[in-house]
Amino acid sequence: APGAGVDLSRIPGMSEHAYLMRTVGDAMKLRAAIISRMEEANLITKHQQRKEMLSFVVVGGGYSGVETAGQIQDLIAGVRRYYDNIREDEATVTLIHSGDRLLSMLGERLGDYTGRCLEKMGVKIVFNKRVRAVTARTVQLSDGTTIPTNLVVRASS
């Protein structure tokens, strides 16, 4: 599978700035971090600053990455009503995958279907790009694109 065996911890900044998604404990820490970002963003008055605070990036288009991106999107949708100052378009979840199809090990139809479902939920998917570096506020991709973000999840090996 594309990306299989890639050691994401060797990407500059990944170990320092990204949340790991492997255990239930990791999931609980991630949930708390997302809620914390929502709380903080609700106090920010400037739209662009709220958008940057609420930009979440998931790296990895396998089982864990797909599930994590969908769950983050669901969590945001479920709690947004408690935050009067956060508009629907301000929170974004971006899934970055080095291959051309999600869940490639399951075949073309299921991978494409999964991608359509995530996009319908509001998850933005970036295909055929690798993460080159992660900082506290950005993810830099192999094509030179920089994605502003406040939280990165490493949902791959």
Residue spans for each PLM region:
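N-terminal Rossmann-fold NAD(P) dinucleotide-binding loop
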Residues: G65-V66
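FAD-binding core/adjacent interface of flavoenzyme oxidoreductases
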Residues: A1-V57, L75, V153
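Alpha-helical hydrophobic/aromatic positions enriched in membrane-embedded helices and signal peptides
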Residues: M14-S15, V59, K120, S142
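A Rossmann-like FAD-binding core segment of flavoenzymes
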Residues: Q73-S157
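Glycine-rich Rossmann-fold phosphate-binding loop(s) that bind the pyrophosphate
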Residues: V59-G62, G99
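Glycine-rich loop/hinge motif
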Residues: A69
